[in-house]
């Protein structure tokens, strides 16, 4: 399971929302072997006044943050592969350069998740976590 949050300046984020979601999802499906129907993305388009962009490093008003919460268990290689794919595909799909993209992966134990009325470690999944 993964929950994905995407933050950016509204006038930059909203026009690319669909393409960005498709790019992110393709990365998760490939790198983490998620089923194609497992897409949980939430977009947070912010007013410029509510989104401070770190200076330097070539950042622009396209600066975007992707936060991915997921079950623990993926290998370091799988997580790094996901990050590499995100930098590549987000740039191609949404014209957000690697300098403008920040990615955070946060893993937690399955027992810290609750969905479908149960604790995450009690639910049978139709995909592997240990990739």
What are these regions (language model features)?
Residues 1-131:
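A domain-level signal for the structural core that forms small-molecule/cofactor-binding pockets
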């Amino acid at each position: 399971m993964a929950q994905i949050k995407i933050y950016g300046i509204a006038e930059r984020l909203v026009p690319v929302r669909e393409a960005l979601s498709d790019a992110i999802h393709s990365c998760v499906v490939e790198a983490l072997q998620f089923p194609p129907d497992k897409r949980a993305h939430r977009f947070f388009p912010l007013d410029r006044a509510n989104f401070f962009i770190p200076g330097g490093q070539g950042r622009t008003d396209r600066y975007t943050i992707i936060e991915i919460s997921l079950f623990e268990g993926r290998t370091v290689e799988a997580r790094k592969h996901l990050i590499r794919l995100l930098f590549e595909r987000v740039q191609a799909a949404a014209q957000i350069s690697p300098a403008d993209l920040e990615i955070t992966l946060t893993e937690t134990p399955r027992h810290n998740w609750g969905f479908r009325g149960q604790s995450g470690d009690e639910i049978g999944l139709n995909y592997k976590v240990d990739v």
